[in-house]
């Protein structure tokens, strides 16, 4: 579920 968080952060940035 860590990859999901990274994906979200990348989406925000």
UniProtKB/Swiss-Prot annotation:
Going by the UniProt record, its keywords in alphabetical order are: Amidation, Amphibian defense peptide, Antibiotic, Antimicrobial, Immunity, Innate immunity, Secreted
Share an example GO biological-process annotation for this protein: innate immune response
Function as written in the Swiss-Prot or TrEMBL entry: Amphipathic alpha-helical antimicrobial peptide with potent activity against Gram-positive bacteria, weak activity against Gram-negative bacteria, and moderate activity against fungi. Also displays anti-leishmania activity by damaging parasite membrane. Stimulates insulin release from pancreatic beta-cells in a dose-dependent manner, without increasing intracellular calcium. Protects beta-cells against cytokine-induced apoptosis and augments beta-cells proliferation. In vivo, intraperitoneal injection together with a glucose load into mice does not have effect on plasma glucose levels.
- What's this protein's name? Temporin-1Tf
Modification type Leucine amide: residues: 13
Q: In which tissues is it expressed?
A: Expressed by the skin glands.
Its taxonomic placement starts with:
Eukaryota, Metazoa, Chordata, Craniata, Vertebrata
User: Family, per the entry?
Assistant: Belongs to the frog skin active peptide (FSAP) family. Temporin subfamily.
């Amino acid at each position: 579920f860590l990859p999901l968080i990274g994906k979200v952060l990348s989406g925000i940035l």
